[in-house]
A protein has these predicted regions:
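Boundary at the C-terminal end of the N-terminal hydrophobic targeting segment
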Residues: 20-25
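N-terminal secretory signal peptides that target proteins for export/translocation
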Residues: 1-4
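Bacterial N-terminal signal peptides
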Residues: 6-18
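Acidic, Ser/Thr- and Gly/Pro-rich intrinsically disordered linkers and low-complexity segments
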Residues: 31-34
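Structural detector for internal amphipathic alpha-helices that build alpha-solenoid repeat scaffolds
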Residues: 36, 41-55, 64, 72-85, ...
Length: 225
């Protein structure tokens, strides 16, 4: 029994090594498919595989597809899932060469990743009426939910275009939840107050007011170290 127990760590290490080698092989195979003359279905499947096993080496191949239909969404989803910061950088760089639906998708992915480095770019898009993705940029700023990310939300709620105030309110509710989770209760309440003041009475203002009341009653949560 003792001998068997002593083998367990060795077996675990060997098993982990096998898993890593398999992942590397899958990544290499998927990248080879993207570089080949394979069909759309095969390349889409390769993008999906890279979302699971891809690392920094995967990023250039996926980034090159962000403006190419019908693979752009598959490539974007792959980059969205890769944890390495270079994936977020690739998405940010793509903002200047995309428009329409493809631009909106990348904006959304930056929010899902909570890319704080993208806040200046998202702010520009949110406050530019000609960007075509102002609502999407506001939503992503809400998902990021840092103090800096909430500044454009406050701007729109304060004196922004009327058609953007509802999207900004939705984003502010999401951002307030993140601020509260991070222990920034005062900032969360102030942001929710902006929602209450910006809109006529309705479900969004009711939700904001209820959350303000709840935050006043809740003790400050411990901020994760």
């Amino acid at each position: 029994m003792i001998a068997i127990r002593s083998l367990i760590p060795v077996l675990l290490v060997l098993g982990l090594a096998d898993v890593c080698r398999a992942a590397e092989a899958t990544e290499s195979s998927a990248l080879a498919v993207l570089a080949s003359g394979a069909g759309v279905h095969e390349k889409a499947r390769a993008c999906q595989q890279l979302a699971v096993v891809g690392g920094p080496a995967t990023v250039p191949a996926l980034a090159a597809l962000l403006d190419q239909e019908p693979l752009a969404d598959y490539a974007r989803s792959g980059l969205e899932a890769i944890k390495d910061p270079v994936a977020g950088e690739a998405l940010r760089k793509a903002l200047v060469r995309l428009n329409g639906r493809l631009l909106a998708g990348v904006v959304n992915s930056l929010g899902v990743r909570r890319e704080t480095a993208a806040v200046p770019d998202l702010r520009r898009l949110a406050l530019d009426p000609k960007s075509g993705v102002a609502s999407e940029a506001l939503a992503s700023l809400g998902m990021i939910g840092t103090g800096e990310a909430t500044k454009p939300l406050r701007t729109v709620l304060g004196d922004g275009p009327a058609e953007l105030r509802v999207p900004a309110a939705h984003a502010a509710l999401a951002a307030a939840a993140q601020l509260a989770k991070d222990g920034n209760l005062v900032d969360a309440r102030e942001l929710l107050g902006c929602v209450v003041r910006a809109l006529p009475s309705g479900h969004l203002t009711t939700a904001a007011q209820r959350r303000i009341t709840a935050l006043r009653a809740d003790p400050a949560p411990a901020v994760p170290k």
